[in-house]
């Protein structure tokens, strides 16, 4: 049975935490991914647990920048430690960049792999799976680049995102099958007319029912995080629409009884 969580990305980096969590819970979700909030903003683990109420912190997400110096890596290590303290199972990373839209240089691929592997080994010591998120306009976009990253790492896992896979002309289901042993969790969102939209409203032809059936068939143990980067209405309205879409396919959003 799949476990669903909802990303906080749509509320921005400095939201009113109790209000945001109430809004997510009221729209039907049991778990969240904490997206790029500073530790200062989140507060102590005890405070965050109070703010979460009945919601579960499923995953956290951050940004890795190149060059990956010790200061930047130290901040990410502290984020991973925090993820472990609040019981998050995975920590997602996105980043690197394609300067002027050129392909990354070999040394950029190598540096990203070294930094991600260091963080992944640190996460493994804390019981947190560190996952790189292949992403348009970042160092790792395509299947070939994913292969390069995975061949250079061992502890690192993936956060596969159906929309970003489709945006580079590749098949999300083929990626799920190929990388199932290295995928700790996934992101689902839709795309239309140059922007991300609610599930089922896109124009890329992403077959979300088929993706969910594939995850079900492989008894996927990780979180399925629904993400909505920006909303034309409000974050809460989009969260409710995404919940309704999954429920229309027969899925339940209850996560508490499904803890791994």
Model-derived segments and spans:
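Short acidic, glycine/proline-enriched helix-loop-strand junctions
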Residues: 41-59, 104, 128
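Aromatic/hydrophobic pocket-lining residues that form π-stacking "cages" and hydrophobic walls in ligand
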Residues: 20, 46-48, 79, 119, ...
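N-terminal small/glycine-rich loop or linker at the start of catalytic domains
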Residues: 1-9, 56-63, 95-99
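Active-site acidic/histidine proton-transfer and metal-coordination neighborhood
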Residues: 67-158, 165-167, 236-237, 255-256
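Alpha-helix-loop-beta-strand connector modules within alpha/beta enzyme cores
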Residues: 48-64, 113-123, 152-153, 208-209
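Conserved beta-strand positions in the central sheet of alpha/beta enzyme cores
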Residues: 33, 59-61, 92, 131, ...
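Acidic-and-aromatic substrate-binding clefts and catalytic sites of carbohydrate-active enzymes
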Residues: 11-16, 34-46, 64-74, 99-103, ...
């Amino acid at each position: 049975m799949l476990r669903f969580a909802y990303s906080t990305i749509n509320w921005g980096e400095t939201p009113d935490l109790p209000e945001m969590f109430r809004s997510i819970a009221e729209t039907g979700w049991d778990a969240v991914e904490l997206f790029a909030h500073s530790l200062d903003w989140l507060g102590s683990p005890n405070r965050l647990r109070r703010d979460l109420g009945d919601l579960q912190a499923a995953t956290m997400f951050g940004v890795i920048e190149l060059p990956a110096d010790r200061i930047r890596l130290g901040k990410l290590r502290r984020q991973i430690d925090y993820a472990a303290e609040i019981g998050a199972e995975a920590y997602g990373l996105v980043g690197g960049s394609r300067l002027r839209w050129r392909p990354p240089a070999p040394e950029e691929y190598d540096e990203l792999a070294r930094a991600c592997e260091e963080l992944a080994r640190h996460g493994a010591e804390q019981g947190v799976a560190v996952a790189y998120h292949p992403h348009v306009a970042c160092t790792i976009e395509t299947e070939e680049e994913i292969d390069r990253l995975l061949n250079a790492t061992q502890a690192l896992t993936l956060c596969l995102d159906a929309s970003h896979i489709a945006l580079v002309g590749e098949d999300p289901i083929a990626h799920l099958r190929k990388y199932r042993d290295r995928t700790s969790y996934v992101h689902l969102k839709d795309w239309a007319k140059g922007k991300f939209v609610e599930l089922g409203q896109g124009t890329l032809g992403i077959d979300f029912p088929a993706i969910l059936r594939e995850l079900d068939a492989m008894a996927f143990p990780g979180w399925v995080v629904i993400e909505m980067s920006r909303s034309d209405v409000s974050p809460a309205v989009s969260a409710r629409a995404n919940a309704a879409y999954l429920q229309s396919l027969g899925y339940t959003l209850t996560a508490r009884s499904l803890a791994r």
